[in-house]
């Protein structure tokens, strides 16, 4: 039974790996598909059925079959001569199709194992890459986009570091982001983002290409990580940058070095040295935990195609092409043609992230099946 499911899923996966287009759930759960056949057999079995261990999944699978049967029965009414009945049927069909799609997504979410840190908060880091001042300007826009996305999702957003350039861009910044499933959504943003546009200072009208890097570090509520105080070197210095009389008058900036790994965490955002030390320590713990998590993730998910978190940051994951008003995510080959709205950090960004999540769920499901073969 499992081998038939596995071979069918692998055939679908082979096509997906070539086309790299979503949505996977529609194919996997299509009538006669490998996953659908597997679910129907398990639901119908008396011994060891889904009801015993997965009652919610069994209920969703049964409801899906009922809704599809209801859809077929209603579609037959489209040929009726009564126009009022046909209009009523069209309305019922639209509702059924929506419910079927929702049930398929629910079943996939129940089947796909959750990542350990999906429910965690996170540390967001943005850093200007290749492209000089244009890269710094784009980095500033990206940081603003994520701050607006956090507001759109009603998450907490607290700036930890902010190092602007002299001409208005942003060299580097970090923020603590918290809220329901914040890491589950934001983990797909980690990587190199490329921008193509004509700078305002470009007199010849030539398109310049610049890059910036996003790092997403999981920040669980309770990090089970022991840090020996003897492994830390903590330095204080006077804050630099904007700040009025506060600048260069108190040793409020804090720099923590983790000696075994060489990881450095700094914070000068607050006027209080104690608060800066607390925030710097928070960042350090997140970076150390992320390092540990990446090692474990690499062991468990070596074949995953969708970049998650901070893995493979040398690979460009997304291009923002301003002359074409286009944003393209190269991992799933998806393009949107409303770049200005995308940069507002609301519905369009959320839609892109959901598409990445759908493809990631598909890969995780096929991988889970492979391990059970």
Swiss-Prot record:
Record PTM N5-methylglutamine, positions in chain: 245
GO cellular-component term (any): mitochondrion
SUPFAM superfamilies with a match to the protein in the record: Release factor (SSF75620)
PROSITE patterns according to UniProt: RF_PROK_I
Transit peptide, UniProt annotation: 1-25
InterPro entries (UniProt xref): PCRF, Pep_chain_release_fac_I, Pep_chain_release_fac_I_sf, Prokaryotic/Mito_RF
Keywords, in A-Z order: Coiled coil, Methylation, Mitochondrion, Protein biosynthesis, Transit peptide
Protein name: Peptide chain release factor 1-like, mitochondrial
Source species: Mus musculus (Mouse)
Gene: Mtrf1l
């Amino acid at each position: 039974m499992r081998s038939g499911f596995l071979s069918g899923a692998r055939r679908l996966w082979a096509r997906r790996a070539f086309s790299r287009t979503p949505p996977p759930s529609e194919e996997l759960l299509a009538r006669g598909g490998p996953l659908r056949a597997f679910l129907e057999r398990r639901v119908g079995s008396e011994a060891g059925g889904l009801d015993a261990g997965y009652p919610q999944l069994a209920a969703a699978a049964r409801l899906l079959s009922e809704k599809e049967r209801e859809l077929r029965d209603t579609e037959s009414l489209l040929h009726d001569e009564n126009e009022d009945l046909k209009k009523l049927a069209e309305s019922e069909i639209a509702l059924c199709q929506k419910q079927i799609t929702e049930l398929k997504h629910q079943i996939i979410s129940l089947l796909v194992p959750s990542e350990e840190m999906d429910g965690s908060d996170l540390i967001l880091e943005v850093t200007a890459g290749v492209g000089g001042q244009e890269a710094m300007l784009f980095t500033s826009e990206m940081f603003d986009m994520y701050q607006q996305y956090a507001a759109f999702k009603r998450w907490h957003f607290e700036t930890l570091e902010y190092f602007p350039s002299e001409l208005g861009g942003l060299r580097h910044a970090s923020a603590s982001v918290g809220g329901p499933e914040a890491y589950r959504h934001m983990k797909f943003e980690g990587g190199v983002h490329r921008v193509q546009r004509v700078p305002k200072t470009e007199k010849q009208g030539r398109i310049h290409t610049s890059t910036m890097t996003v790092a997403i570090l999981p920040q669980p509520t309770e990090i089970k990580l022991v840090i020996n105080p003897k492994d830390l070197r903590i330095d204080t210095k006077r804050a630099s940058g904007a700040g009025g009389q506060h600048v260069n008058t108190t040793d409020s900036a804090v720099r923590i070095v983790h000696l075994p790994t060489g990881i450095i965490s700094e914070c000068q955002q607050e006027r209080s040295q104690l608060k800066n030390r607390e925030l710097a320590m928070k960042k350090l713990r997140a970076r150390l935990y992320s390092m540990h998590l990446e090692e474990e993730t690499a062991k468990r998910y070596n074949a995953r195609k969708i970049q998650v978190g901070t893995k493979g940051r040398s690979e460009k994951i997304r291009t923002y092409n301003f002359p074409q008003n286009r944003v393209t995510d190269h991992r799933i080959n998806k393009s949107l043609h409303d770049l200005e709205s995308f940069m507002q950090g609301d519905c369009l960004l959320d839609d892109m992230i959901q598409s990445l999540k759908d493809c990631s769920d598909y890969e995780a499901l096929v991988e889970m099946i492979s391990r059970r073969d």
